[in-house]
């Protein structure tokens, strides 16, 4: 991607400021007021940049974001987007990542993870910290390593889940799920994995009131 057009230290405002952008690298750039600044963008790199308003990355593809921040009003930040890599970033806004495919998050902090990662597929989480309810609802094919979660009802309705070396402080975790494997992890919370199928825990510590009810395998 060396032939990318670079945008440095820009302050971008207004609705759809960079609509359908392609082959661009944004460095130290602020996406300020104005909805959907990168709607329908593809082949984009974002470095040390920030989003301050709603819907920044909708219907996008081939996105790389490093050292970026989604501030509190950058709600519903990444929806309907395919092939996105996010590293060393902070999300203050809720409801990020919905109906996305091929999502890789590494060293990411979700300050408010409420309703985040809904209906996404092919998801990789590495060194992710999240605080908020209803994480990863109805996701499929999700792998997490060193996930640190404080929040209730995660992974409701999800399938094909692998979690390793993680810590989940979560009530009603893994409800209505299918094909769940958790290894080398700590889970604390009531009513674990109700109404689920094919659930496996290996070398885990579990603290749960009325856990594993109505489980098939």
Model-derived regions, located:
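Long, distal/terminal scaffolding or interaction modules
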Residues: 1-217
């Amino acid at each position: 991607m060396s032939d990318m057009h670079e945008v440095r230290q820009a302050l971008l405002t207004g609705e759809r400021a960079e609509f359908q952008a392609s082959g661009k690298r944004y460095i130290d750039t602020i996406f300020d007021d104005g909805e959907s600044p990168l709607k329908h963008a593809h082949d984009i790199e974002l470095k040390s940049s920030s989003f301050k308003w709603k819907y920044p990355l909708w219907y996008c593809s081939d996105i790389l974001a490093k050292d970026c921040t989604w501030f509190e009003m950058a709600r519903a930040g990444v929806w309907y987007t395919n092939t996105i890599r996010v590293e060393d970033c902070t999300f203050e806004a809720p409801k990020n990542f919905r109906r996305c495919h091929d999502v890789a998050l590494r060293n990411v902090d979700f300050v408010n993870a409420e309703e985040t990662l809904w209906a996404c597929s092919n998801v990789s989480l590495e060194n992710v910290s999240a605080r908020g309810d209803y994480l990863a609802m109805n996701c499929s094919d999700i792998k997490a390593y060193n996930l640190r979660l404080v929040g209730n009802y995660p992974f409701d309705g999800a399938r094909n889940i692998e979690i390793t070396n993680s810590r989940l402080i979560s009530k009603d975790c893994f409800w209505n799920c299918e094909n769940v494997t958790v290894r080398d992890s700590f889970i604390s919370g009531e009513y674990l994995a109700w109404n689920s199928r094919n659930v496996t825990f290996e070398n885990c510590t579990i603290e749960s009131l009325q856990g594993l009810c109505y489980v098939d395998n």
